[in-house]
Amino acid sequence: MKIIFAGTPDFAATALDALIKTPHDIVAVYTQPDRKAGRGQKLTPSPVKQLALEHNLPVLQPLHFKSSTEEGLAAQAELAAFNADVMVVAAYGLILPQIVLDTPKYGCLNIHGSLLPRWRGAAPIQRAIAAGDAETGVTIMKMAAGLDTGDMMFKTYCPIEASDTSASLYEKLAAQGAEAICTVLECEQQLQKFLAEREVQDENQTVYAHKLVKAEAQIDWTQDAIQIDRNIRAFNPWPVAFIPLDDKNNLRVWESTVSKLIAPDAEAGKIIAMDKHGIHVACGTGVVCLTALQWPGGKALNPVQIIQTQKLNIGQVLA
């Protein structure tokens, strides 16, 4: 089949890499415009663009597909000219109007990192961890104009381990998503079968995964230890949980566990112990053990290194 691929980050590049290895013809790759990145703020191509160029695939980077502008209409016409059988979309980042969704013969399929209709939206992986979900997965859906509202065609399931961060779960789901889209697109008859058997989402089961904002990564010590640990894992690698040091500087918390220690009478935020396992901090309920901390301008430190800095003390109350 002739496939158009649209995606931007590593999550999408994993799926594109898998599709490149199939007999299908990748006729075009769409990705977001190059962005400034790194300390030098150099224009950097997305992981999807880098992979596409390595395989000599045509890359297109329109700003939008809006019918209200000449640029948008030109982008629509350019896409239609590829005469694709199907378009695969994974974390692309641009809104696709209905005219684009209807352009390929079999429409547009989306690789979404959750078990829809739970966690529609921008941050499904992070929200699943923060909510304490026992499992998540990947849904392949036929795209509709609404936000992740399309009919579901195929699902894979992935348990969320107690040690999972958004970074580790992201990698697992990227691999599952790549495998899932290759299953759905194994051949044209297989695609027709999945389209015929697709399932409408139950709107009563919908939960939205709202976009992350930096402010919510500040640790609230009045929460229980289990929730604080979930948040720390959910916000790794971005925006990273933090403890304010002063008006401008934060202590970043990369990793944690729920401590076995108990301190029912300790003030929330108080350091009750420091050992080889980590920095044990009293919470609203329970104790959380911080195992990787990063001071401004430094690298992330393990528990032994943290103690050696002598920057934290037992009895100290964290902000």
Curated annotation (Swiss-Prot):
GO terms for molecular function: methionyl-tRNA formyltransferase activity. InterPro entries: Fmt, Formyl_trans_C, Formyl_trans_C_sf, Formyl_transf_N, Formyl_transf_N_sf, Formyl_transferase-like_C_sf, Met-tRNA-FMT_C, Met-tRNA-FMT_N. It holds the Pfam family Formyl_trans_C. (6S)-5,6,7,8-tetrahydrofolate binds at S114, L115, L116, P117. GO terms for cellular component: cytosol. It is an enzyme of class 2 (transferase). Gene3D superfamilies: Formyl transferase, C-terminal domain, Formyl transferase, N-terminal domain. It catalyses: L-methionyl-tRNA(fMet) + (6R)-10-formyltetrahydrofolate = N-formyl-L-methionyl-tRNA(fMet) + (6S)-5,6,7,8-tetrahydrofolate + H(+). Keywords: Protein biosynthesis, Transferase. The keyword Transferase applies. Its EC number is 2.1.2.9. Attaches a formyl group to the free amino group of methionyl-tRNA(fMet). The formyl group appears to play a dual role in the initiator identity of N-formylmethionyl-tRNA by promoting its recognition by IF2 and preventing the misappropriation of this tRNA by the elongation apparatus. Belongs to the Fmt family. This is Methionyl-tRNA formyltransferase. It comes from Acinetobacter baylyi (strain ATCC 33305 / BD413 / ADP1).
